[in-house]
Amino acid sequence: MKPSAVFIRGYYTRCYMWAVDFDGTKLVHRWLHASVNDSTVEHYDSRWNKTTKSYSSNTCGMGQHFTAFGNGNHNVSVGDYDGDGRDEVTIGSATVDDDGQLLYSVGFGHGDAIHVSDLIPSRPGL
């Protein structure tokens, strides 16, 4: 598996994450994640096929944001959070899977820092 470059825009409202690969001469679109509001994600696959998903809750069941909308912050963390051997991308209170689909959304909005670690060693996973 080759690494991709991920470009991200949006902290306080809409959140866009765009993954591209380099084929040796140019950037090639891999996927685009667009959290366009608190409950809607538009996803474009490698062929620009669009799917739209609606969310009515987030991962923790608290907070007001169900997608990456309004959950951004000023840095990005990358790691294999779900144990599938591929890295996920976290911006603020939301994580996008390696295919650009929303994986987690805590829903507490804009934070100032990200700390990803095995904070509870007795609990499986991160």
Placement of each model-derived feature along the sequence:
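Beta-propeller-forming repeat regions
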Residues: 1-126
